[in-house]
């Protein structure tokens, strides 16, 4: 029985008995030889200063388990071998060993004596010592101690009591979690368990964690309040009684310093967002909390976990029995649980704000949801539902923004394509969804960039597209934008799908039917889909080419927005066609279409023709002149059996001409045997044995039987003389047998807007990195030509330094114009430099004589001309200014007439002559102007006025000819006029009560009242500053100036 009961003495939680502690050391030395061989014995522990309790604790430890909190076996030890032993020996602890053993064993002896159990006698012999050694070896070799026997009933209540003490709460005086750093960087936060935990254990631990967390918060508050300092005092004042912005800033700082102990401020921010009242306060708190979540509160690589997802079954093992480590885990887990609930509440508030009546609030809530969805995985499902739901917003701005935000989300996280498309699909198939929301959702799906690794997603998208396609066809809603969006989506998803052929093949007949009734843009999408399907199977049918041949004459081609897409489709179709005569028919019709198109499309079509000629050299025979392609009239035989000839004009037949031809070919005697008209289509069954036409039929439906091989591409000759220089250059290049070498986009480079942009002489705004990134989905990247001459301003030195042969033909006009302008400005500068010379005294005196009158005191009649010199001087000043203005205007705009726009045929001499003569004006009224008969044919009033003014005294050309060298004296007869000549003016104003004779005389032809006339006179005085107030102000101002001048003169004299 002793051997069975002996292992109970070595239980970790049971104190050691004093009877076994007091043993003869000599006997122990004899019996511990086996333990010394293993390298671990009681004697070794006692020699190092330990006790028997230390020996038993070390003996029961498992080497594979953690020794201390955070320590593991195999960790790097910095201590060298024997270093610890030497340190303990230096302490001289051996003399205290026996005394410490006796003192520790006394309380254990008292406790064991009080129990009513069978006492084990003292170990005084070898048998008991051997049994003890065997039990120690068993404990040391096993991971856990052996189970207790039924006979030992004293240990069971002790274990139950220990289990009950696990959930007891003990207050501490120090913080378990130190402030600073991110809370999710602690190793405790990543511990979780996928197994469901018992609910009773979880509830008990949660209660304990709540108490621990509350005590931790209270302890943190007490220590914070006890701190003394300016920063802490200021922070407390701001949080409690500050403005909204200051309070938010202070709370952010506190949360960033220690998020675990400031969870109350996180809850305060959420309540501010929820608060109904000021929208400005709500939006401010919304942005603040969003930034806080992204930067500090939410981890990057995982979601937040609730409290029940923690490994409570391994909690004691993880903490190694250390209560502080266990409590730290509980506090951190409880904090994360509470934070997860607050974030979920915030997401619900975002959902409420996204349905607000104000557009600004909805937009801000949508943007916040998108940023959280892009940056953090927390609540991503709820946030994704919110953003996708905004595709159906009644306001188009919000729906468009939601589509754009989803595109940017997929650009940042491409792995979310399946999740996002599934959510959009659920939106599409809702029962109460609007058609506009469906359209926006389809537009988002067809903009999704796919890859060959995502064939399942492509198949799923094609299924959704054709489901809505059938719905649109059944509703006969083929003119809607939805059909075009669906066909666009199928075109983009088809190359990446694996089972798309079967689904498309079912709808081929429907696509051909829809092709002829929809608008041009939608028909281009349908043709592209048909070409992809047939080209992948190498079975491009004649039906497709006939439909494409017919679509080329659609008037919508001129105004559609998919001209580049259509030309690309034509190029691919012709390159894949093996029938050469059908390719000739397409090229012929394409050149015919260009006759009514704008220059950008013509340039693009000519470039396409050049590439087709490069791919199929057999088409070069069409460049040769055929007899039917001449512009002259031709006579050909109608039939081989008849001698009759008919008169036709090749390539310009109409239905009326055909009727006349058939009537002429029929003999007059046999009118009843008239031949039927030739049909515009040919049945397949009638191909064998039929006669081929030897002429071109432009109205044929089938390009195989239009006879395009019998004519030439004479349209190129007409295009070679086109008004647009680039069109003419492209056409001449093809006629000469060369290929067009062009690296740009003709549809964009030759537009009117691009031409007008060349007149804006400033550097364009730089594009901020959106063209060469993935932010612009499904858009072609822009080509940047660093040395492209088209990016140089046309008036720059670099542009003008180029040779004319290096300039594009559409910009030769700018090059020639600014070259001549530069030469003209240089000549003007040279002339101005030559004119700036020193003036001699004699020349200066002669110049003064032209302005001053030498005989002003000799003749009395000239004394009456008081303002003669003033008028002439002002006139001379005006002459000079007008001369300068006229010369400047001539330099800039004098030669831009209609006849002089084409500067290619104008020589430099002619340009200079026109410039010199263009700045002068004719002298209309000269000294002999009275003899001109055209000027004498006027009314009586005009002749009297001209006599009274004296036309001889006014020189209107003087302002353009500069100062006269000879002074012209005034005629005395112009000043003295008889009263008979203006007597009719006196008769009209007879009886009026105002001044009608003096200097301020006023005419009153409409017999206005005196009050009205006075008001007009006062108003005229006020306008010309002749009223009393204006005169007084002038006098005061004059006095002030005079005072200032006198003061200045006095200072200068001093």
Swiss-Prot record:
Q: Locations of Acidic residues compositional bias?
A: 21-34, 882-902, 915-933
Query: Where, per UniProt, does this protein localize?
Result: Nucleus
Q: Which UniProt keywords apply?
A: Acetylation, Activator, Nucleus, Phosphoprotein, Transcription, Transcription regulation
Give the main localization category: nucleus
List-wise, which residues carry N6-acetyllysine?
695
What biological-process terms (Gene Ontology) are attached?
positive regulation of transcription by RNA polymerase II
- The UniProt regions of compositional bias labelled Polar residues, in chain numbering, are 124-138
Positions bearing Phosphoserine: 113, 629, 835, 959, 973, 978
Say which family it is in: Belongs to the CBF/MAK21 family.
Q: What does this protein do?
A: Stimulates transcription from the HSP70 promoter.
What protein name is recorded for this chain?
A: CCAAT/enhancer-binding protein zeta
Q: Which gene encodes it?
A: CEBPZ
């Amino acid at each position: 029985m002793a051997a069975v009961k002996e292992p109970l003495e070595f239980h970790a939680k049971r104190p050691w008995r004093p009877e076994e502690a007091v043993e003869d050391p000599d006997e122990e030395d004899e019996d511990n030889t086996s333990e010394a061989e293993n390298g671990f014995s009681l004697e070794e522990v006692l020699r190092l200063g330990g006790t028997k309790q230390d020996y038993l604790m070390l003996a029961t430890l498992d080497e594979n388990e953690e020794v201390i909190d955070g320590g593991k076996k195999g960790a790097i030890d910095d201590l060298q071998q024997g270093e610890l032993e030497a340190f303990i020996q230096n302490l001289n602890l051996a003399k205290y060993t026996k005394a410490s053993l006796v003192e520790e064993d006394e309380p254990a002896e008292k406790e064991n004596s009080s129990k009513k159990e069978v006492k084990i006698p003292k170990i005084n012999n070898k048998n008991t010592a051997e049994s003890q050694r065997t039990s120690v070896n068993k404990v040391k070799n096993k991971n856990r101690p052996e189970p207790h026997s039924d006979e030992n009933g004293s240990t069971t209540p002790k274990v139950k009591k220990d289990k009950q003490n696990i959930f007891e709460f003990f207050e501490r005086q120090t913080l378990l979690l130190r402030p600073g750093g991110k809370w999710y960087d602690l190793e405790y936060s990543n511990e979780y368990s996928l197994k469901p935990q018992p609910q009773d254990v979880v509830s008990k631990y949660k209660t304990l964690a709540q108490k621990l967390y509350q005590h931790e918060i209270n302890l943190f508050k007490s220590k914070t309040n006890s701190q003394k300092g300016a920063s802490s005092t200021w922070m407390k004042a701001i949080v409690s009684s500050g403005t909204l912005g200051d309070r938010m800033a202070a709370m952010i700082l506190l949360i960033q310093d220690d998020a675990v102990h400031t969870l109350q401020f996180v809850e305060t921010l959420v309540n501010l967002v929820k608060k109904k009242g000021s929208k400005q306060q709500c939006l401010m708190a919304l942005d603040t909390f969003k930034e806080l979540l992204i930067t500090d509160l939410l981890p990057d690589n995982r979601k937040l976990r609730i409290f029940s997802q923690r490994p409570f079954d391994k909690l004691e093992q993880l903490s190694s029995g250390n209560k502080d480590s266990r409590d730290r885990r509980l506090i951190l887990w409880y904090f994360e649980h509470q934070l997860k609930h607050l974030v979920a509440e915030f997401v619900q508030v975002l959902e409420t704000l996204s349905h607000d009546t104000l557009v600004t609030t909805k937009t801000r809530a949508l943007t916040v949801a998108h940023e959280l969805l892009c940056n953090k995985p927390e609540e991503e499902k709820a946030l994704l539902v919110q953003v996708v739901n905004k595709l159906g917003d009644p306001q188009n701005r919000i729906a468009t923004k939601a589509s754009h935000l989803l595109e940017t989300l997929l650009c940042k996280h491409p792995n979310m394509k399946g999740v996002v498309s599934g959510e959009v699909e659920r939106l599409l198939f809702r029962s109460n969804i609007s058609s506009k929301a469906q359209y926006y959702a389809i537009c988002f799906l067809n903009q999704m960039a796919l890859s060959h690794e995502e064939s399942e997603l492509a198949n799923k998208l094609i299924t959704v597209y054709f489901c809505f396609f059938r719905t649109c066809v059944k509703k006969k809603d083929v003119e809607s934008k939805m059909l075009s969006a669906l066909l666009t989506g199928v075109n983009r998803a088809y190359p990446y799908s694996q089972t798309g052929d079967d689904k498309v093949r079912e709808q081929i007949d429907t696509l051909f039917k829809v092709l002829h009734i929809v608008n041009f843009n939608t028909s281009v999408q349908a043709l592209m889909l048909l070409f992809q399907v047939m080209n992948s199977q190498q079975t491009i049918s004649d039906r497709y080419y006939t439909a494409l041949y017919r679509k080329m004459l659609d008037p919508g081609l001129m105004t559609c927005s998919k001209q580049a897409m259509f030309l690309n489709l034509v190029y691919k179709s012709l390159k894949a066609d093996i029938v050469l005569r059908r390719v000739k028919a397409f090229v012929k019709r394409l050149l015919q279409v260009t006759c009514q198109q704008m220059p950008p499309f013509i340039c693009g079509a000519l470039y396409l023709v050049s590439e087709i000629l490069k791919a199929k050299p057999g088409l070069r025979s069409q460049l040769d002149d055929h007899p039917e392609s001449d512009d002259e009239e031709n006579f050909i035989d109608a039939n081989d059996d008849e001698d009759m000839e008919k008169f036709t004009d090749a390539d310009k037949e109409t239905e009326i001409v055909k009727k006349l031809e058939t009537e002429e070919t029929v003999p007059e005697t046999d009118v009843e045997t008239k031949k039927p008209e030739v049909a515009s289509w040919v049945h397949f069954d009638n191909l064998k044995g039929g006669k081929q036409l030897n002429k071109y039929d432009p109205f044929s439906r089938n390009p195989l039987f239009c006879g395009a091989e019998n004519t030439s591409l004479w349209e190129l000759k007409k295009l070679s003389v086109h008004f647009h220089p680039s069109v003419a250059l492209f056409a001449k290049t093809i006629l000469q047998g060369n290929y067009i070498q062009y690296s740009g986009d003709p549809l964009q480079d030759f537009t009117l807007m691009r031409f007008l942009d060349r007149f804006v002489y400033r550097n364009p705004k730089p594009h901020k990195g959106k063209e060469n990134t993935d932010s612009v989905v499904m858009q072609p990247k822009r080509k940047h030509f660093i040395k492209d001459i088209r990016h140089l301003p046309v008036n720059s030195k670099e542009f003008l330094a180029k040779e004319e042969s290096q300039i594009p033909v559409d910009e030769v006009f700018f090059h020639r114009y600014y070259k001549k302008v530069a030469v003209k400005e240089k000549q003007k500068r040279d002339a101005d430099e030559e004119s700036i010379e020193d003036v001699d005294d004699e020349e200066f005196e002669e110049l003064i004589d032209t302005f001053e009158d030498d005989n002003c005191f000799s003749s009395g009649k000239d004394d009456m001309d008081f303002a003669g010199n003033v008028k002439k001087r002002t006139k001379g000043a005006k002459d000079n200014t007008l001369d300068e203005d006229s010369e400047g205007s001539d330099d800039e705009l004098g030669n831009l007439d209609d006849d002089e726009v084409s500067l290619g045929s104008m020589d430099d001499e002619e340009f200079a002559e026109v410039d010199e003569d263009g700045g002068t004006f004719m002298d209309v009224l000269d000294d002999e102007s009275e003899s001109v008969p055209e000027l004498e044919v006027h009314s009586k009033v005009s002749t009297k006025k001209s006599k009274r003014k004296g036309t001889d005294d006014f020189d209107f050309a003087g302002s353009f000819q500069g100062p006269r060298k000879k002074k012209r004296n005034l005629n005395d007869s112009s000043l003295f006029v008889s009263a008979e000549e203006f007597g009719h003016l006196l008769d009209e104003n007879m009886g009026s009560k105002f001044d009608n004779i003096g200097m301020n005389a006023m005419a009153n032809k409409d017999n206005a009242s005196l009050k009205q006339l006075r008001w007009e006179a006062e108003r005229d005085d006020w306008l010309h500053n002749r009223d009393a107030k204006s005169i007084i102000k002038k006098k005061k101002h004059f006095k002030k100036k005079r005072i200032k001048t006198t003061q200045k003169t006095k200072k200068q004299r001093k």
